[in-house]
Amino acid sequence: MKAAIIGHGKMGREIEKILLERGHRIGAVIDEANASELDAAHLAGIDVALEFTTPDAAYGNIRACIDAGIPVVSGTTGWTNRLEELRSYCREKGGALFYLSLIHI
């Protein structure tokens, strides 16, 4: 599996480590410094995006992945007031979103 990690803080770095230990590949690491790279061109060949950012960034990050045709797993909390909107958008675009509100590693 080739993953994109969106949010390279403590959780993002831990997920990266686990993925690599299990033989998966990291195709992109997106954080504040290169957020403009969250588009279809930079996500080409990615199987899944793992999104662990901030509530303010999560909605746009998830939408960008859906627009790029990349399934998303998000563990960012604090943005679920827009979850229904994203569910509708996923259905409309044929996208996939798996949201987890509490993750322990």
Regions found by a protein language model. Name each.
Residues 2-14:
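Glycine-rich adenosine-cofactor-binding loop
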Residues 21-38:
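NAD(P)-binding Rossmann-fold cofactor-contacting core
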Residues 37-45:
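Short amphipathic alpha-helix with an adjacent loop that forms part of the alpha/beta core around
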Residues 49-50:
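N-terminal Rossmann-like NAD(P) cofactor-binding module of classical short-chain dehydrogenase/reductase
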Residues 64-82:
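ADP-ribose/adenylate-binding Rossmann-like module
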Residues 76-98:
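Rossmann-fold NAD(P)-binding glycine/threonine-rich loop
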Residues 103-105:
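Conserved small/polar residues in nucleotide/adenosyl-binding loops
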